[in-house]
């Protein structure tokens, strides 16, 4: 309680304050600090660069610290702090709306899910991560991108960077079930949010390799990927015509 009163009394917050509160999973203090950033933004007390720096809440400790230079959001995702990720993404939404004609602000906010060049949903961390935190992050991140006019190609580019630079066809070709599952989740959310992107998603799913073999046929050749793919398709909220078209591949 005293700690909360201390932060409420502070006129400004530093990147260290927010990073520290996130790392200790102190949801109440995180909320106070995020509210502080929004209030100062609306009063024009801080500029865009400072807002993004505060939202990054990067670790600044010595090299021995595991989270050196990691953003607060990255730490929260990897540690599975679902409530904090949700609160951070809600604040990101408010900031993006404040700078509504500036797509780079959205790009910058979404890039904070990465630890420098390393993605948040890194394969090494993913197996230990809470699936709930991934759902919360992806749903909020994709919604944010779509609300601010990202094209399908821009969404793919954004999340390819999140996934170690691996596009959908590449992960299927490599038998990478972890990243394939993440891509299928993204396709489901994108179409659920905006059916205009259905055609783009279908093109990704039906893409053919040099030998004329479709991505789905490749997935069918791997028992793990096959099970993962058709389980995801069964959960897709696609129009019946497209679902029927996909299901023709089931026996191939």
What are these regions (language model features)?
Residues 2-11, 32-58, 86-108, 136-154, ...:
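Ankyrin repeat domain, specifically the short helix-to-loop turn at the C-terminus of the second helix
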Residues 4-9, 13, 20, 26-32, ...:
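Terminal export signals
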Residues 10-20, 50-75, 105-125, 154-173, ...:
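Ankyrin-repeat boundary/"N-cap" motif
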Residues 25, 80, 128-129, 175-178, ...:
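Ankyrin-repeat intra-repeat helix-capping/turn positions
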Residues 205-252:
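Leucine-rich solenoid repeat scaffolds
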């Amino acid at each position: 309680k005293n700690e909360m009163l201390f932060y409420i009394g502070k006129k400004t917050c530093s990147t260290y304050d927010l990073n520290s509160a996130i790392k200790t999973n102190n949801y109440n203090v995180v909320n106070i600090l995020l509210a502080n950033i929004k209030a100062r933004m609306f009063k024009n007390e801080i500029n865009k660069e400072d807002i993004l720096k505060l939202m990054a809440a990067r670790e600044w400790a010595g090299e021995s610290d595991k989270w050196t230079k990691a953003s607060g959001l990255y730490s929260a995702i990897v540690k599975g702090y679902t409530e904090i990720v949700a609160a951070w993404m809600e604040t990101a939404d408010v900031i993006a709306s404040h700078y509504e004609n500036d797509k780079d602000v959205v790009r910058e906010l979404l890039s904070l899910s990465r630890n420098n060049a390393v993605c948040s949903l890194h394969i090494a961390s993913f197996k230990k991560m809470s699936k709930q935190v991934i759902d919360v992050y992806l749903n909020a991140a994709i919604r944010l991108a779509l609300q601010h006019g990202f094209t399908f190609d821009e969404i793919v580019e954004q999340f390819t960077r999140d996934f170690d630079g691996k596009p959908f066809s590449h992960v299927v070709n490599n038998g990478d079930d972890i990243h394939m599952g993440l891509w299928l989740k993204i396709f489901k959310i994108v179409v659920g949010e905006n059916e205009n992107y259905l055609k783009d998603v279908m093109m990704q799913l039906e893409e053919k390799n040099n030998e004329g073999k479709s991505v789905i046929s490749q997935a069918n050749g791997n028992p793990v990927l096959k099970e993962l793919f058709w389980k995801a398709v069964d959960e897709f909220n696609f129009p019946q015509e497209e679902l029927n078209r996909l299901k023709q591949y089931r026996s191939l």
